[in-house]
């Protein structure tokens, strides 16, 4: 069952301005080490950071908190599954909020799609609660 949906649309030029104005301070405040390594290795790093920024905003909306109630920028990070599909890795307050949302006997699956077409970057997050299969031999 779907327990959270969030979306965000951002102007890439806004991120370009933040990168120029605040540099590492902005990057280190908002992004995880994995996101920084991925974005710094890209030809268009502003678009890469913008997609990840939009993903964090969308995820915070799917959590139902926004960037409040103990959920911080670096608690949410875009990571890629082995096949390359992006998803969100949650820690700290974001992970705690996700656990609060989950019904008993369920685990979370976070679905993420990110895209950009200058000057815009967009992200959608769906949080799904999936039933945990009972262990063998239990009733």
UniProtKB/Swiss-Prot annotation:
Keywords: Cytoplasm, Fatty acid biosynthesis, Fatty acid metabolism, Lipid biosynthesis, Lipid metabolism, Magnesium, Metal-binding, Transferase
Localization per record: Cytoplasm
Keyword Lipid biosynthesis applies: yes
GO cellular component terms given for this protein: cytoplasm
SUPFAM superfamilies, per database record: 4'-phosphopantetheinyl transferase
Cofactor(s) the protein requires to work: Mg(2+)
Gene3D superfamilies assigned: 4'-phosphopantetheinyl transferase domain (3.90.470.20)
EC numbers on record: 2.7.8.7
Principal location class: cytoplasm
Example GO molecular function: magnesium ion binding
Enzyme class: transferase
Catalyzed reaction equations: apo-[ACP] + CoA = holo-[ACP] + adenosine 3',5'-bisphosphate + H(+)
Amino acids binding Mg(2+): 8, 57
One record GO biological process: fatty acid biosynthetic process
One Pfam entry name: ACPS
Function: Transfers the 4'-phosphopantetheine moiety from coenzyme A to a Ser of acyl-carrier-protein.
NCBIfam families listed in its UniProt record: acpS (TIGR00516), pantethn_trn (TIGR00556)
Family classification: Belongs to the P-Pant transferase superfamily. AcpS family.
Record HAMAP family: AcpS
Protein name stated in the entry: Holo-[acyl-carrier-protein] synthase
Organism: Rhizobium meliloti (strain 1021) (Ensifer meliloti)
Phylogenetic classification of the source organism: Bacteria, Pseudomonadati, Pseudomonadota, Alphaproteobacteria, Hyphomicrobiales
Gene that produces this protein: acpS
């Amino acid at each position: 069952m779907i327990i959270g949906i969030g979306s965000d649309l951002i102007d890439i030029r806004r991120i370009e301005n933040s990168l120029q104005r605040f540099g590492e301070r902005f990057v280190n405040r908002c992004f995880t080490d994995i996101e920084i390594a991925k974005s710094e290795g890209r030809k268009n790093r502003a678009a890469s950071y913008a997609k990840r920024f939009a993903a964090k905003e969308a995820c915070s909306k799917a959590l139902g908190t926004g960037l409040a109630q103990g959920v911080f920028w670096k608690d949410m990070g875009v990571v890629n599954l082995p096949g390359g599909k992006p998803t969100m890795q949650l820690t700290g307050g974001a992970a705690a909020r996700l656990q609060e949302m989950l019904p008993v006997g369920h685990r979370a699956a976070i679905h993420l799609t990110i895209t950009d077409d200058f000057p815009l970057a967009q992200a959608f997050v769906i949080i799904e609660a999936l039933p945990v299969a009972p262990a063998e031999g239990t009733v």
